[in-house]
């Protein structure tokens, strides 16, 4: 069951203009592994903030072979209360893993249909130094509202 839920609206419906020309780059750095990728945004109605779900790529882990930094990743969560000007780290999605051992979650997408929230995400068992692995899409749902 997906432990985190939200409601989507437009990020561009802002009270004040956001000067993208002078925005910090990057807009968010994951404090755990540094390299967030594959973001998707959802509006959290209870907390009145945007939540970003992303691949928590292990960019700052030393001595990994080849592309191993993109394996072993969880779904990270960051949030903003001011339409993306400042982000803070929330944690990781508490997703049950389809298999035991350290696995990989890539490129989450979260959406709502009626009263149910869904996450679809790529799952790969294990950590690999080269591109490959037995990739599959896994599907999580939740009826909990936050």
Regions found by a protein language model. Give the residues of each.
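Carbohydrate-active catalytic/glycan-binding domains of CAZyme proteins
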Residues: 13-145
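Bacterial N-terminal signal peptides
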Residues: 1-8
